[in-house]
């Protein structure tokens, strides 16, 4: 999230599917996956994911809220995709990450809206 000319990198969320693959059914059927924030990763892995997310955000020239997804393998984090319009329902990942970071959903929206005025 880039707000008020400052970038905030949210806590990492670990998605643990209860099926072999994290497919549409696993994502949208209650009980078929767990979303754990903050992730149960080592500090080193968490920092690497946050650094990569920040670099990708800058390289792509992002503004506002995005979600950067990775798959973590034995070789480390592998970039999967960037969601430039991530879900923002109370059940979505970004609002939960913001809450863990200490930012309410209302404050999160306010920061992004205020940042839009710096573009003018």
In which residue ranges do the predicted regions lie?
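Phosphate-binding site of ATP-dependent enzymes
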Residues: 1-51, 72, 77-78
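Cytochrome P450 core scaffold surrounding the K-helix E-X-X-R motif
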Residues: 21, 89-93
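Peripheral (often C-terminal) accessory segments that flank ATP-dependent C-N-forming ligase machineries
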Residues: 44-47, 59-60, 65-67, 71-74, ...
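Short amphipathic alpha-helical segments
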Residues: 50, 54, 109-110
């Amino acid at each position: 999230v880039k707000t008020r000319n400052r970038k905030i990198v949210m806590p990492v969320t670990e998605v643990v599917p209860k099926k072999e693959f994290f497919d549409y059914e696993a994502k949208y059927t209650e009980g078929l996956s767990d979303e754990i924030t903050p992730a149960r990763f080592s500090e080193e892995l968490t920092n690497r994911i946050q650094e990569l997310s920040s670099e990708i955000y800058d390289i792509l020239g992002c503004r506002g809220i995005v979600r950067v997804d990775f798959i973590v393998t034995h070789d480390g984090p592998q970039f999967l995709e960037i969601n430039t319009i991530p879900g923002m329902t109370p059940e979505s990942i970004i609002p939960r990450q913001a809450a863990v970071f200490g930012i309410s959903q209302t404050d999160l929206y306010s920061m992004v809206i205020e940042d839009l005025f710096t573009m003018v």
